[in-house]
Amino acid sequence: MAKRDYYEVLGISKDASKDEIKKAYRKLSKKYHPDINKEEGADEKFKEISEAYEVLSDDNKRATIDQFGHDGPQGFGGQGFNGSDFGGFSGFGGGGFEDIFSSFFGGGSQRDPNAPQKGDDLQYTMTLTFEEAVFGTTKEISIRKDVTCETCHGDGAKPGTSKKTCSYCNGAGHVAVEQNTILGRVRTEQVCPKCNGSGQEFEEACPTCHGKGTENKTVKLEVKVPEGVDNEQQIRLAGEGSPGVNGGPAGDLYVVFRVKPSETFKRDGDDIYYKLNVSFPQAALGDEIKIPTLNNEVMLTIPAGTQTGKQFRLKEKGIKNVHGYGYGDLYVDIKVVTPTKLTDRQKELMKEFAQLNGEEINEQPSNFKDRAKRFFKGE
């Protein structure tokens, strides 16, 4: 099944700016986010929106889509084949059959090795108590990540030294490679493996980062946990990922939450559930019982004749929605508890109650010991 046009998915024109792409994505992702939209198909719609944004926000991927269409650069001029016909063929620097066409037809999807590139995104898993997730908190975390080298400030060269023309590619930034392929011997150009396309090399590499421009360190960060986060949800800390390349922006850090269950409540989204045991007299006669909520205790009125399974709803006594859409509710589920041990007087009263109710009770022992006693008494 062919993919939908990514511009159509986001509802934008093909000459849309990056800001217009981002605005359209934010609007649609908020509308179809699975945590907000429970309608059937919303999850797939959200994935489609995310995929469209991922492609159109990347200049190289967008250029490929604009040049070859949404099915990629496989179909050319009625040749009757595409890249999948050649299985795992990768005779052009590991790029596969599509890269052969890139060489023949102008290389529209090739990336400039000197172009600014965003750094890698990172992920951190944070464990929260139920209370921390409900009310929000601020926590300090320690993560190991690549940071800009303090010695060379990301340049890669030893301070006080300069760069020189790459001796491998003579400053071109790329080298010619000839390879035998199924189409014959083909000459292609590849990024210089020594200078990574810059055309320059160090007189002397930085002694701290050994020319990488980055060093791996433990970094402490303060993370503000918003009220109402749920298990598996995440927040993005912009610019806290790995450093960018060639002056590109740093990546982002995604903090994924693991929320411990509550000993008092069961959570379902923004709603919480509380199990309340009531005695037989309380259920039969009614009562007022003090129950816990997230912030304090309140009195709950139990009407006379309440049965097991009865549910009471306390509006807006649940969890604050993490996106700011009000509060959930607190549901109280009733369970009428049958007494397991009765005094003789209590038994008499229960029998009297049964008689008044027109019931004839054939009392049964509750365990082996009681049955044995009745046997030896001849009952």
UniProtKB/Swiss-Prot annotation:
Residues given in the record as Zn(2+) 2 binding sites: 166, 169, 192, 195
Quaternary structure and interacting proteins, as annotated: Homodimer.
Subcellular location: Cytoplasm
CXXCXGXG motif repeats: from-to residues: 149-156, 166-173, 192-199, 206-213
Keyword Metal-binding: yes
Residue ranges covered by zinc fingers (CR-type): 136-218
Keywords: Chaperone, Cytoplasm, DNA replication, Metal-binding, Repeat, Stress response, Zinc, Zinc-finger
Gene Ontology annotations for the cellular component aspect, listed alphabetically: cytoplasm
Boundaries of every J domain copy: 5-69
Pfam family, one: DnaJ_C
PROSITE patterns documented for this protein: DNAJ_1 (PS00636), DNAJ_2 (PS50076), ZF_CR (PS51188)
PANTHER family: CHAPERONE PROTEIN DNAJ, DNAJ HOMOLOG 1, MITOCHONDRIAL-RELATED
Cofactor annotation: Zn(2+)
Any one Gene Ontology BP term: DNA replication
This protein's domain notes: The J domain is necessary and sufficient to stimulate DnaK ATPase activity. Zinc center 1 plays an important role in the autonomous, DnaK-independent chaperone activity of DnaJ. Zinc center 2 is essential for interaction with DnaK and for DnaJ activity.
InterPro entries listed in its UniProt record: DnaJ (IPR012724), DnaJ_C (IPR002939), DnaJ_domain (IPR001623), DnaJ_domain_CS (IPR018253), HSP40/DnaJ_pept-bd (IPR008971), HSP_DnaJ_Cys-rich_dom (IPR001305), HSP_DnaJ_Cys-rich_dom_sf (IPR036410), J_dom_sf (IPR036869)
Primary location class: cytoplasm
Protein name: Chaperone protein DnaJ
Family according to the record: Belongs to the DnaJ family.
Superkingdom to which the source organism belongs: Bacteria
Known role: Participates actively in the response to hyperosmotic and heat shock by preventing the aggregation of stress-denatured proteins and by disaggregating proteins, also in an autonomous, DnaK-independent fashion. Unfolded proteins bind initially to DnaJ; upon interaction with the DnaJ-bound protein, DnaK hydrolyzes its bound ATP, resulting in the formation of a stable complex. GrpE releases ADP from DnaK; ATP binding to DnaK triggers the release of the substrate protein, thus completing the reaction cycle.
Any one Gene Ontology molecular-function term assigned to this protein's record: ATP binding
UniProt remark on cofactor binding: Binds 2 Zn(2+) ions per monomer.
Residues that bind Zn(2+) 1: 149, 152, 206, 209
